[in-house]
Amino acid sequence: SRGLGDVYKRQMEHTLRQAKECGGLHTLSKDKLHALVRASIEEYIDRVLPDLCEKSARFRYLFNRLCAAVERIMDEVSEELQSSDFEPLAFELAFGADGQLPAITIREENGTARVVGKVDRVDGWLHDGKLYLRVVDYKTGKKSFDLAELRYGLGLQMLLYLFTLKEEGQVLFGGHEIVPAGVLYTPAREPMLRCARDTEPEKIEKALKKELRRSGMVLEDPAVLQAMEHSALESPCYLPIAVKRDGAVTGSLASAEQLGKLSKYVDHILHEITQEVFAGNIDADPYARTPQQSACTYCEFASACHFENGCGSDRMEYIKATKNDEFWQYIDEVNGEGAHENG
């Protein structure tokens, strides 16, 4: 549930903050890290669940299971960051009136719109006077980065925050020139595996690692990839990339030029949405993966909307899978730059 997801995120953020104050994750033993997790959870119980002992046995069981899961997730995040030159620079970074950065502003002739939001974590790597930033979002569900969604103007938040940090983040991060290095969805959940009782522990661990692999898009630069994960160019474990036998790196990669084009595309979509809002266009026009997986599934306005696919003019628009070259060609078309040339 969303409530459990918030607990996961809160404990991870609090533990990472404490670890940073203690000198960084690389200075902590696993026992010390677990002690920080337990201290964070105890503080949460005192503040939010002082009556935990009075809760049902089922609730206490689920909460204790959650606490154990947080320890495992933090072990995994710790291992990732200890094998990386990127370090957490900000947690719960907010854009808006009460945030560390101003709201994202979209100006049109007939008005101004402002976007507010929050980034779970921002990691950075300072190299040759430039600060490479990546935006990290914790996901408690199965959400993953998807080019098809981007093509339909969905799932743009992470990229929007990344590109905004490039323009507005210097004052917050020491005045260095900022280079967008990517966006990552980090699983913040206890993975569930189906396996035989006699499955070897090594195979289980390998399967767990696979379930907890990040999704996203990262800068196609060998130095940056190796800074993100020291073994990225040989045997990546965390990043959404793979290495072929000939040493070529494949996966969810984008060149600096492509990220620039993506920034322009995101800006275009924002202006398009703003114009629609100012024009009063609020038609129900939902997207869907399948009839059972659509924008309507968790919509808070479903009871007022009464959209019914196939009834009258109500038609669900289905998201089609998008290949990498098709995606970049589409981005070029929207940006008015012609066909994308693959090098």
How would you label these PLM feature ranges?
Residues 1-343:
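Structural signature of nuclease core domains in nucleic-acid processing machines
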